[in-house]
Design a protein with these regions (language model features):
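Phosphodiester-processing cores and adjacent nucleic acid-binding clamps
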Residues: 1-106, 110-115, 119-133, 140, ...
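Glycine-rich active-site loop/lid that clamps phosphate-bearing ligands
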Residues: 734-743
Length: 757
């Protein structure tokens, strides 16, 4: 009922494997189909953003009548470009000048709620430690047993220690304006920065992260905890998890790293980040993928999206199809990037309390920023990651402020996984089948109306809520051009001289059967068929089939044709089918005489040559061949060749693999792909999920209710596979990305089989 409707930019369908239930099947009505529902509500556009795949694009396209589809994915994204930044802040200081190496111990990991209990620091100059600083810090609370066990610091040791503000001021006075270095500096600098903000203390020191240096310079180490790196570098033993010892170890660690950097031609801190770019892509340091929304702005963007999806499945698959930031940057033309949900890079940084400049650096890469209803992120409250709903609202306020400062639109999205609130139970069952312990936690990520979304974000103020819910989402929709997910028309590959070879085969066979001057009915039929076939560029399809059939026959395996290809005389003359589609007639195998008149005589009409009586050739006395099945060519190609040829061939099971290999030989390894298939949850499987779900929870339900729940879970993607016989061939002047993505069947990176998506 809102006068201007929003646009949903973050929506999952049944092709988000075992995770979402939103349907886009053209057969479903608005009560089930989200595209038709959005259109019925008056929405101008809707995005499709499944997890790492584009498998709902065709159905969404067919479902859309008067609504624009925005084609995209929610990618599993890894930042391999600037996530491991060694130096933060501006500095041109040479390696041999003074650096303050420090470490802190805290009451916990969350810089918003926890506090510092010890600060230790050393001054490193020209490879030597020249000064030290150490202080306990009063936490104003009792330490937990876990922190006492981990750090060895007790409550008694903190009696009389300076306050948080006093300790911070003392440490910063010791550090001055010198660069600070720490192992996992993001943690240590984050606590220092948070304390400085709280007490109004200026803090602008540049920082160096020895953890990131280790990950980049020691790519094969695998694990990079301070003690592991120290042991690898043969540094002195130390009391780990005490600030003073950890700080000294960082001090001892930097000189060998600086020596490695000098061997690379570097001389000062400001050169480090640039030199690390090519190193970030390698190494064994684990990176957890985050989420990213990628929308296609135009046809170029769609092609790049298909390419990124394909590379994620083929080259960078690690449990998920990964999109690397470096690869996205190389293929960014025509793409629109959104910051995604709570699993996105930006929201994580906001929740982690990263400083404002770092948030701006992260957000600047995106084209638009996302915020979502706080109900989407209530799990953070249940898990103790935040302490109140208001804190979740503050996260969204921070993103809005970032958008305002950077001039980027902020969009409210739903992260839709099912259509209506009552559908949530089906997702609980699916998640339970995968073993998720929190499968039953409420998460109302259904397709919300514009009014519902405006109410969700009313705490931002009426005008801002309208901007993020309506104005900005429509703006993103306007950025996207109308796109067809698959280009129209036939894109036939090339076989050298295919039209000439087809003509030679056909006329050669015609002369073999009907003599040097075939009857006019034969000539006319061949001319009509060849004219349509060559004009519509179907000659490649015919010759492909002919070569496959001939190859099989040469190896001793018969091929059976079926279907309407039997209505094509050219197919018969070229050896694709054994069915002669001419009217019933006699032909002499010896002198080539033929008789088309006998079967047309009203006194004894025959529709099929095989039914005619036996007769001998009146010219040479040889028994006639009875031929012709009287099938019009239009049955196969339509009138004027308006139907693409569908040549169905049955190859021997023993020889089928050879036929596949021969197809690769004909068209090239890079232009032939196995046809992919999608396996979905069948009703019997869904019924098993329902029974197990109810049993594990000690619940009972009527048979009708069990059936209802099972039906609600059917049709959701489980896996992918390959068609036993289907092959997809693309033209030599095209790439598969011009048509669709590709992948390994069943997401198996160990197979060399590549299928269409």
């Amino acid at each position: 009922d809102a006068p201007e409707k929003r646009v949903e930019l973050h929506l999952h369908t049944t092709m988000s494997s075992m995770d979402a239930l939103t349907q886009v099947s053209p057969k479903a009505g608005p009560d089930k189909n989200v595209v038709k529902r959005a259109e019925a509500w008056g929405h101008r556009a809707i995005a499709i953003t499944d997890h790492g795949v584009a498998q709902s694009f065709p159905d969404a396209w067919h479902s859309a009548k008067n609504i624009k589809i925005l084609y995209g994915v929610e990618a599993y994204y890894i930042n391999d470009v600037d996530d491991r930044v060694v130096v933060h802040g501006e500095t041109e200081q040479p390696f041999d000048q003074e650096i303050v190496c420090f470490d802190i111990e805290t009451t916990g990991l969350n810089r918003k709620y926890e506090v510092i209990i010890e600060i230790g620091a050393v001054v490193l100059k020209n490879g030597e430690i020249t000064d030290r600083f150490n202080t306990f810090v009063s936490p104003g609370r009792i330490l937990s047993p876990e922190i006492i066990r981990l750090t060895g610091i007790t409550d008694e040791m903190l009696v009389g220690a300076p306050s948080q503000e006093e300790a911070l001021r003392a440490f910063l006075a010791f550090a001055g304006d010198r660069p600070l270095a720490a192992h996992n500096a993001d943690f240590d600098m984050g606590f220092i920065a948070a304390g400085c903000r709280k007490y109004g203390i200026p803090f602008h020191n540049p920082s160096i992260d020895s953890l990131i240096l280790a990950q980049n310079l020691l790519p094969d180490l695998g694990k990079y905890k301070l003690d592991i790196v120290a042991e690898h570098l043969h540094l002195p033993a130390f009391n780990h998890h005490r600030a003073s010892d950890d700080a000294a170890t960082v001090g001892y660690m930097l000189p060998p790293f600086f020596k490695m950097l000098e061997e690379m031609g570097l001389r000062h801190l400001g050169e480090i980040n640039g030199a690390m770019v090519h190193l970030r892509k390698g190494g064994k340091a684990k990176r957890q993928p985050k989420h990213l929304i990628v929308l296609a702005r135009n046809q170029t963007g769609l092609r790049n999206l298909y390419k990124l999806i394909s590379l994620g499945h083929l080259d960078y698959f690690k449990r998920y199809p990964i999109m690397l930031k470096s690869v996205i940057n190389e293929n960014r033309e025509g793409l629109i990037l959104g910051s995604a949900c709570e699993a996105g890079e930006l929201f994580r940084a906001v929740a982690d309390g990263k400083d404002w400049e770092e948030l701006k650096r992260i957000a600047s890469w995106y084209d638009y920023l996302e915020i979502q209803p706080i109900c989407n992120n209530m799990f953070m409250l249940r898990k103790g990651m935040v302490r109140s709903e208001e804190e979740l609202r503050d996260f969204n306020r921070t993103v809005v402020k970032l958008g305002e400062e950077l001039g980027k639109p902020v969009c409210a999205t739903g992260d839709v996984h099912f259509l209506d609130p009552e559908d949530e139970i089906y997702r609980h069952i699916l998640l339970a089948s995968k073993g998720f312990e929190d499968a039953d936690e409420p998460l109302p990520i259904y397709f919300k109306t514009t009014t519902e979304m405006l109410e969700e974000f009313s705490y931002l103020g009426k005008e801002t809520a309208y901007d993020v819910v309506v104005r900005n989402t429509n703006l993103i929709a306007d950025w996207c051009e109308p796109i067809e997910p698959l280009p129209k028309g036939l894109f036939a590959p090339k076989l050298e001289d295919s039209d000439g070879e087809l003509k030679r085969l056909v006329w050669g066979k015609a002369h073999e059967l009907y003599g040097e001057e075939p009857p006019q009915i034969v000539v006319d039929r061949i001319n009509v068929e060849l004219g349509d076939i060559i004009r519509c560029k179907y000659d490649v399809i015919y010759m492909s089939a002919q070569k496959l059939v001939q190859n099989s026959l040469e190896h001793g395996y018969l091929v059976g044709s079926r279907g309407s290809v039997g209505s094509s005389l050219v197919a018969f003359m070229s050896g694709i089918t054994e069915v002669n589609s001419l009217p019933a007639h006699y032909r002499c195998p010896k002198c080539k005489h033929s008789d088309f008149d006998y079967a047309q005589d009203p006194a004894h009409p025959y529709g099929c040559g095989a039914d005619m009586p036996d007769m001998n050739c009146p010219v040479c006395g040889t028994p006639y061949v009875k031929d012709g099945f009287n099938i019009p060519f239009e049955t196969f190609l339509g009138f004027g060749g308006d139907k693409v040829p569908d040549i169905d061939l049955n190859f021997s099971g023993e020889y089928q693999a050879n036929a596949h290999r021969y197809t690769f030989e004909l068209f090239g390894q890079t232009h032939v792909f196995r046809a992919g298939t999608i396996g979905t949850v069948a009703e019997k499987t869904a019924f098993g999920y329902v029974k197990k779900y109810l049993e594990e929870r000690g619940r009972t339900a009527s048979k009708a209710e069990e059936n209802r729940l099972a039906i609600g879970c059917t049709g959701v993607k489980r896996t992918t596979g390959q068609h036993p016989g289907g092959m997809v061939v693309i033209p030599q002047d095209k790439e598969i990305y011009d048509f669709c993505p590709v992948q390994h069947p069943a997401d198996d990176p160990n197979t060399d089989i590549i299928t269409t998506h």
